[in-house]
C-alpha cells in the first residue's frame, strides 16, 4: 500500500467531524457530509478536544496515536485472500425448498452479509416464516446511538407482525394456552445466522406485552386477521409504543430495567419485506432501502425502487413534518439536513428523546438509573417545543410480483451511501453472470461513450478478484472498494478493511445487505392459475 491510503482516509475522516456539547456527553455529527453518523455518543474522557482547530473539530486519542507514529504503521498490506476472508466472514446463504399449496415458493434463495464499522456493530437483520399464516419476512434494522434498539426490534417486530395476521380462532387458541399455562402454538420459524445474538433474559417481559396486543386484536373480532398492509402498519407503531411504555412502567429486575432504558434512548430504522406468493409488501421507517431488479422482455435490466428515504432530502417528508408542527417551527424542524439538527432519519424506533416531553424524560431518568454507566445521552435539542418530532409509522408499499422481477435488495444506508440503486442492480446482475446463475443480456440502447466506459470498467473490475459466491458480499466489496469512477481499487479496499475501529466509523457506516432471489417459474405458475 502506498504511503498511504489509510493515512489519507484517516485525515479525511477526522476533518469532517464537528462537536456539540450536550449534558455530560459530547455529541458528534458530520459537519458537511450526508453520509455520516446519525447519532454518535462519546464520553468526554475518550476525546481530546482541540478548540484551536479551524474546523472546530477534535482528535480521537486512539486515532491520534496512529497519526503520530511512523508511516510504516500504515503499511499493513492484506493479500487478496485475506481481503476476501474478511469480507466473507459475515455472509450467509439459504435455499428455500418449501411449497405453498403445491406450488414452489416464490422465493428461490436469499443471501446476506454484514460488515461492521461500529464496535459493536449497530445493524441487525432477520428472516423468519410465519407458522400459523403464510409468508416469509425479511428485515434490515439500522441502529444508532448504540445497538440496543436495533437488537430489540429485530427480535420482536416479526412476532407482532405474525400475531397481526392470525385469525380470530388462532388468537383464541393462543390466549387459552396462556391462561392454562400450556405451550403456545409456534409463531415463527427463524432462519438464524450463526452470529445472530438474542436477549434471552427479557423474553418473558416481551411475551407479556405481545399478549396484551393479541388480546386487543381479539377484541376487534376479525375472523381472518388484519390485512398485510394493516398488519405492517400496526406492528411498527405498536412495538414502538411498547418500547416507550416499558421504561415508564415500574420494573424491579435491574437487567430488564437497564436494557429497556438503553432500547428506548437509542434508535433504529427498519425496512421489512413480507413475501406471500406473488404478494410483496414492503414497510419502511427511516433510511434503509428496498429495490427490485427487473429484467424486461428485451433482456435489459432496470431498477424499481420500493421505498423512499425518510430524511431531509425527501420533500414529502418535509411537508409531513410541517403539517404536524406549528408554522413557527418551519425553519427549525430541519437544521443542517437533520431533524432538529441531530438526527438524519425522520422516522425511527426508540429515540424517545425526540418523542417525549421534557418533563417525562426528566421524570424517567431521575428514577435511579446509572445513566453514566449506561451511556444514556442526556441532551434536549434547541427548538424542542412540540414533541413528538419522530415517528415509527412506516410507509407501506405493495407490489405484485411478475416473472420479470428477479431479485429484491434490502440494505441499511451504509450501502446506499456508497452505491446508487442502478449500481446495485448492475452489480448483482454482473455477479449472477460470474457465478454462472444467469448471463446478463446486453442492453438494447444505442451505444454511447458512457455505456462503453461502464462496460470497460466492469471487465477491468472482474479481473481483480475471484468471483464472490454471495451477492451481498459482492455488493459490499464494491461499496467500499470502488473509486468515484466505479473502478475497483484493491489498495482502497484493503485500506478500508484495515482502518482502526475509531477511524472506520468516521469514513463509512455499518453495512448490512440482503439479496432475495425470486423463482420466476413459480411466479409464472401463480399468474397462470390466477
From Swiss-Prot:
EC number: 3.1.3.43
Domain PPM-type phosphatase: 107-518
Gene Ontology CC annotations of this record: mitochondrion
Transit peptide: 1-67
InterPro entries reported in the protein's UniProt record: PP2C, PP2C_BS, PPM-type-like_dom_sf, PPM-type_phosphatase-like_dom
PROSITE patterns (UniProt xref): PPM_1 (PS01032), PPM_2 (PS51746)
Enzyme category, top tier: hydrolase
Activity control: Mg(2+)-dependent protein phosphatase. Phosphatase activity is increased in the presence of spermine, a naturally produced polyamine.
UniProt-annotated binding residues for Mn(2+) 2: 142, 413, 509
Cited CDD domains: PP2Cc (cd00143)
Cofactor needs: Mg(2+)
Reactions catalysed: O-phospho-L-seryl-[pyruvate dehydrogenase E1 alpha subunit] + H2O = L-seryl-[pyruvate dehydrogenase E1 alpha subunit] + phosphate
GO terms for biological process, alphabetical: peptidyl-threonine dephosphorylation; response to starvation; signal transduction; T-helper cell differentiation
SUPFAM superfamilies hit by this protein: PP2C-like
Binding residues for Mn(2+) 1: 142-143
Stated family: Belongs to the PP2C family.
Role of this protein: Mitochondrial enzyme that catalyzes the dephosphorylation and concomitant reactivation of the alpha subunit of the E1 component of the pyruvate dehydrogenase complex (PDC), thereby stimulating the conversion of pyruvate into acetyl-CoA. Acts as a crucial regulator of T cell metabolism and function, with a particular focus on T-helper Th17.
Protein name: [Pyruvate dehydrogenase [acetyl-transferring]]-phosphatase 2, mitochondrial
Organism (species): Rattus norvegicus
Gene designation per UniProt: Pdp2
Amino acid at each position: 500500500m502506498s504511503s498511504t491510503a489509510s493515512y489519507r482516509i484517516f485525515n479525511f475522516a477526522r476533518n469532517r467531524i464537528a462537536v456539540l456539547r450536550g449534558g455530560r456527553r459530547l455529541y458528534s455529527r458530520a459537519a458537511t457530509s450526508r453520509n455520516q453518523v446519525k447519532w454518535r455518543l462519546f464520553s468526554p474522557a475518550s476525546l481530546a478536544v482541540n478548540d484551536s482547530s479551524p474546523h472546530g473539530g477534535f482528535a480521537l486519542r486512539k486515532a491520534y496515536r496512529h497519526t503520530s507514529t511512523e508511516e510504516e504503521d500504515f503499511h499493513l498490506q492484506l493479500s487478496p485472500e485475506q481481503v476476501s476472508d474478511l469480507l466473507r466472514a459475515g455472509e450467509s446463504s439459504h435455499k428455500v425448498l418449501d411449497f405453498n399449496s403445491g406450488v414452489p415458493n416464490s422465493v428461490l434463495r436469499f443471501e446476506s452479509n454484514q460488515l461492521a464499522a461500529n464496535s459493536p456493530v449497530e445493524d441487525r437483520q432477520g428472516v423468519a416464516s410465519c407458522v400459523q399464516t403464510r409468508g416469509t419476512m425479511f428485515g434490515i434494522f439500522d441502529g444508532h446511538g448504540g445497538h440496543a434498539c436495533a437488537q430489540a426490534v429485530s427480535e420482536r417486530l416479526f412476532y407482532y407482525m405474525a400475531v397481526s395476521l392470525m385469525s380470530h380462532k388462532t388468537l383464541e387458541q393462543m390466549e387459552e394456552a396462556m391462561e392454562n399455562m400450556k405451550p403456545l402454538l409456534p409463531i415463527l420459524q427463524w432462519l438464524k445466522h450463526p452470529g445472530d445474538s438474542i436477549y434471552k433474559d427479557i423474553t418473558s417481559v416481551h411475551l407479556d406485552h405481545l399478549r396484551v396486543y393479541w388480546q386487543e386484536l381479539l377484541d376487534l373480532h376479525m375472523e381472518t386477521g388484519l390485512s398485510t398492509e394493516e398488519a405492517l402498519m400496526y406492528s411498527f407503531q405498536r412495538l414502538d409504543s411498547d418500547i416507550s411504555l416499558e421504561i415508564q412502567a415500574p420494573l424491579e429486575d435491574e437487567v430488564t430495567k437497564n436494557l429497556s432504558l438503553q432500547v428506548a434512548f437509542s434508535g433504529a430504522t427498519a425496512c421489512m419485506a413480507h413475501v406471500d406468493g406473488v404478494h410483496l409488501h414492503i414497510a419502511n421507517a427511516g433510511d434503509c432501502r428496498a429495490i427490485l431488479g427487473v429484467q424486461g422482455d428485451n433482456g435489459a435490466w432496470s431498477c424499481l425502487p420500493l421505498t423512499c428515504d425518510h430524511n431531509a432530502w425527501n420533500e414529502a417528508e418535509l411537508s409531513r413534518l410541517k403539517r404536524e408542527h406549528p408554522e413557527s417551527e418551519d425553519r427549525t424542524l430541519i437544521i443542517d439536513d437533520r431533524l432538529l439538527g441531530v438526527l438524519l432519519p425522520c422516522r425511527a424506533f426508540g429515540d424517545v428523546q425526540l418523542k417525549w416531553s421534557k418533563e417525562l424524560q426528566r421524570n424517567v431518568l431521575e428514577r435511579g438509573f446509572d445513566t453514566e454507566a449506561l451511556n444514556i445521552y442526556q441532551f434536549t435539542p434547541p427548538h424542542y417545543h412540540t414533541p413528538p418530532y419522530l415517528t415509527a409509522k412506516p410507509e407501506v408499499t405493495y407490489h405484485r410480483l411478475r416473472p420479470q422481477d428477479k431479485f429484491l435488495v434490502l440494505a441499511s444506508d451504509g450501502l446506499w451511501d456508497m452505491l446508487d440503486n442502478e449500481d446495485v442492480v448492475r452489480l448483482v446482475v454482473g455477479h449472477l453472470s460470474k457465478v454462472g446463475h444467469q448471463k446478463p443480456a446486453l442492453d438494447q440502447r444505442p451505444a454511447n461513450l458512457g455505456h462503453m466506459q461502464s462496460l470497460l470498467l466492469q471487465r477491468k473490475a472482474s479481473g481483480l478478484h475471484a468471483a464472490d459466491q454471495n451477492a451481498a458480499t459482492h455488493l459490499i466489496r464494491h461499496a467500499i472498494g470502488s473509486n468515484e469512477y466505479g473502478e475497483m481499487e484493491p489498495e482502497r479496499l484493503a485500506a478500508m478493511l484495515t482502518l482502526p475501529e475509531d477511524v472506520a466509523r468516521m469514513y463509512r457506516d455499518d453495512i448490512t445487505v440482503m439479496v432475495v432471489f425470486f423463482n420466476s417459474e413459480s411466479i409464472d405458475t401463480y399468474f397462470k392459475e390466477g
